[in-house]
Amino acid sequence: NEAQTDATLAPKEGHTRVFEIKDSASPGGTRKQTWRHASRAECAQCHNNRSANLLAFNPPQLVRNGQIEKMQAWDWFAKPLPKKQPEIADPNDQSSSLHTRARTYLQLNCAHCHRRGGGGTSVFEARIELNLDSTHIVNHPPTQGNLGIKDAMIVQGSDPYRSILYNRMARLGPGRMPRFGS
């Protein structure tokens, strides 16, 4: 609802809303932003049995202030989580390596599909616990088209413009990744 005190399921076909956003850089201090709520069929492409339906936080994001322990004490997990979680980084933390920040991004935004059995149709795996060679990301050819890029790779070392991953994330419309919610 408009007061944001209750949520309702979007119509089966999805719907579009226009919001007025405060923005000091826009004429008059506001701008309009259109948001499309996905259809249920679109939602089910990611929220499915392979992903355990819920796509929210990743356990490594909760390794702070005893959050995992609190949730386990409240019986929020069907089975205990492993004590050791993969290391993730704040993307803005310049003291973390670019490698760790990039792998963190892929873990949190891509690995729910781009993993064995996860539904992603590409052969690469984005899980942070794999060593980089095992992910088949760097200097591996794409399996879902090259977007017209000569000698494209999923990630082309030292040449982001020949990297399908970069181009799909930067793209609007068909071929964009992720397909929805961005």
Regions found by a protein language model. Give the residues of each.
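Extended surface/linker regions that mediate inter-domain or inter-protein docking
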Residues: N1-T104
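Electron-transfer interface patches adjacent to heme c in soluble/periplasmic c-type cytochromes
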Residues: G66-A102, H112-G117, E125-S182
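Periplasmic/extracellular electron-transfer cofactor-ligation site
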Residues: R40-L55, L108-L132
